[in-house]
Amino acid sequence: MEHIFLALRSPGPELFQLGPFSLRWYGLLIAISVLVGLNLSSELASKKGLKKSLINDLLPILVLASVIGARIYYVAFEWRNYTGKNFWSSINFLNLNIPIPSALEIWGGGIAIHGALIMGTLSIIFFCRWRQEHFWDVIDVLVPSVALGQAIGRWGNFFNNEAFGIPTNLPWKLFIPYRFRPEIFSTIDYFHPTFLYESVWNIFVFGILIFLFRKANKKDLKLPPGSLSCLYLITYSLGRFWIEGLRTDPLCLGGVPPFCEGGLRIAQLISLFLISAGLLGIWRIYVSKKALPDPSSMNGRNQ
């Protein structure tokens, strides 16, 4: 029996249009993620005894660096789609077509969370060095917001009809319009809603992180600096590794989508690296009984 009534279907990428201006769901979701992250991180920072202005000062730098990093990362691995005849695009402003490099069309989709994590982390390192803050104390109050923001932001993929999985007939299947399907799946209507899987997984990760933070804040649990960040790397990456294997649009190293034949899925490689890094961090903290080195310190010493 086919459970059509449970099939997901995107209403489209635009929430509304007013003259030459349009508001896209993806942009709205990112804005919501930022606002939720600001409030949550500020609350956690206050409970941890950090300066009240810290998150407000950091957030604009972090968001800008993360968005730029997410786009650069994506374009770097999909550069063939942004060269030659595809190099130029245009935007319509007041009935004028203004040419711009297509690589700048971030509102049309095409960002990668791992690029955001890389550039975002670098921005936090430089910020902590500038403000003379302990890197691990700062990032530990941010990772719950990152997980929650990812859970919210993933729904942008739903509205854009992107980042979906292989064909399926499960009750929670996702309908993808013909023009968005890979050619080899052109006659198939329903696919795995990988955006939903990752959104639910990130809520689970957020729940673990916020539970542990609150336990530590009540002195019921000892969480040395960096513990939450390492746990985030492990838990998020475990889910991402599995979900990435279902996607039809992976960034590939030496192969081509939808299955990266003859190559490797980059997100899975990065996930394995992050899991390993997180496990090494946990081992250093709890087995070797050593503090994690502070990357924002000029000589990398522990603080």
From Swiss-Prot:
The listed locations are:
Cell inner membrane
The UniProt entry lists membrane topology as:
Multi-pass membrane protein
Which residue ranges run through the membrane?
18-38, 58-78, 106-126, 133-153, 193-213, 223-243, 266-286
Question: In which pathway does this enzyme or protein participate?
Answer: Protein modification; lipoprotein biosynthesis (diacylglyceryl transfer)
GO (cellular component) term, any one: plasma membrane
Is Metal-binding given among the entry's keywords?
no
Q: Which cysteines are joined by disulfide bonds?
A: none
Keywords (A to Z) from UniProt? Cell inner membrane, Cell membrane, Membrane, Transferase, Transmembrane, Transmembrane helix
Q: Name one GO biological process term.
A: lipoprotein biosynthetic process
- Extract the GO molecular function terms from the UniProt entry: phosphatidylglycerol-prolipoprotein diacylglyceryl transferase activity
Give residues annotated as binding a 1,2-diacyl-sn-glycero-3-phospho-(1'-sn-glycerol). Answer: R154
Leader sequence residues: none
User: Matching InterPro entries, A to Z?
Assistant: Lgt
Superkingdom of source: Bacteria
E.C. no: 2.5.1.145
State the family it belongs to: Belongs to the Lgt family.
Q: Which PANTHER family match?
A: PHOSPHATIDYLGLYCEROL--PROLIPOPROTEIN DIACYLGLYCERYL TRANSFERASE, PROLIPOPROTEIN DIACYLGLYCERYL TRANSFERASE
Q: What does this protein do?
A: Catalyzes the transfer of the diacylglyceryl group from phosphatidylglycerol to the sulfhydryl group of the N-terminal cysteine of a prolipoprotein, the first step in the formation of mature lipoproteins.
Protein name, UniProt field: Phosphatidylglycerol--prolipoprotein diacylglyceryl transferase
Q: Which organism is it from?
A: Prochlorococcus marinus (strain NATL2A)
For this protein's source organism, the top of the classification is: Bacteria, Bacillati, Cyanobacteriota, Cyanophyceae, Synechococcales
Gene name as annotated: lgt
